[in-house]
């Protein structure tokens, strides 16, 4: 199956594209886009991969579901398009960055600049029906994104995996902690941010680890 995804990822994920679950998923997604308003726009489904080739990945942040409001989702977890109001979780992410490393909140919630520095901003589910949170869960995306995380964890070394909330922590449970840095805390959602997200210092810890392993730090 010819999937429109960045070449290095295509090479590493090729086996997935031939599996029955992925064929079923593709049929489902095509059908959904033809009948409903689906986010993100079709050409941005694999945006996280396209902006961050396999060998350039330094950090992986695992999200759950794309934003389901108009103009928000563009294929990167927690990120929104330029000119779109910051969702509450993103507000809290920027608050923690300011508290942790002193960088003030930017004027845009578009995290493309992180992706271009090697941060894979990966949602577990890559599509969603407008205004229906979780509507594309358990259709096969989770299996596909598990495969992406697994191939990174197995074939790369000294990556940083950032797992916010129990969902991301379960998804990253198999990652070898001797080979990679795994940072876990509560989710930045207003419902849980004060239960361990604020003060987690994940941004400075990530950069300390990257620096210790001879990698360029992320300009958060």
Swiss-Prot record:
Its main location: cytoplasm. It is an enzyme of class 3 (hydrolase). One of its GO terms (biological process) is base-excision repair, AP site formation via deaminated base removal. GO terms for molecular function: uracil DNA N-glycosylase activity. Gene3D superfamilies: Uracil-DNA glycosylase-like domain. The keyword Transcription does not apply. SMART domains: UDG (SM00986), UreE_C (SM00987). Keywords: Cytoplasm, DNA damage, DNA repair, Hydrolase. InterPro entries: UDG_fam1 (IPR002043), Ura-DNA_Glyclase_AS (IPR018085), Uracil-DNA_glycosylase-like (IPR005122), Uracil-DNA_glycosylase-like_sf (IPR036895). GO terms for cellular component: cytoplasm. Its EC number is 3.2.2.27. NCBIfam families: PRK05254.1-1 (NF003588), PRK05254.1-2 (NF003589), PRK05254.1-4 (NF003591), PRK05254.1-5 (NF003592), ung (TIGR00628). PANTHER family: URACIL-DNA GLYCOSYLASE. Excises uracil residues from the DNA which can arise as a result of misincorporation of dUMP residues by DNA polymerase or due to deamination of cytosine. Belongs to the uracil-DNA glycosylase (UDG) superfamily. UNG family. This is Uracil-DNA glycosylase 2. It comes from Bacteroides fragilis (strain ATCC 25285 / DSM 2151 / CCUG 4856 / JCM 11019 / LMG 10263 / NCTC 9343 / Onslow / VPI 2553 / EN-2). The gene is ung2.
């Amino acid at each position: 199956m010819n999937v429109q995804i960045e070449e290095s990822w295509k090479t590493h994920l090729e086996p997935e594209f031939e599996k029955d679950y992925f064929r079923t998923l593709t049929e489902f997604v095509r059908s959904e886009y033809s009948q409903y308003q689906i986010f993100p726009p079709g050409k941005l489904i694999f945006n996280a991969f396209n902006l961050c080739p396999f060998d350039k990945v330094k950090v992986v942040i695992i999200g759950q579901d794309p934003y389901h409001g108009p103009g928000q989702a563009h294929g990167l977890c927690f990120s929104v398009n330029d000119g779109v109001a910051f969702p509450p979780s993103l507000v809290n992410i920027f608050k923690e960055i300011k508290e942790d490393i002193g960088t003030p909140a930017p004027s845009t919630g578009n995290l493309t600049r992180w992706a271009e520095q090697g941060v894979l901003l990966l949602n577990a589910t890559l599509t969603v029906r407008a205004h229906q949170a979780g509507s594309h869960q358990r259709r096969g995306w989770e299996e596909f994104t598990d495969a992406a995380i697994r191939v990174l964890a197995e074939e790369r070394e000294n990556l940083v995996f950032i797992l916010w909330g129990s969902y991301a922590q379960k998804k990253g449970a198999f990652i070898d902690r001797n080979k990679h840095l795994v940072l876990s805390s509560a989710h930045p959602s207003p419902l849980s941010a004060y239960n361990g997200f604020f003060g987690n210092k994940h941004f400075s810890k990530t950069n300390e680890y990257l620096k210790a392993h001879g990698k360029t730090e992320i300009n958060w």
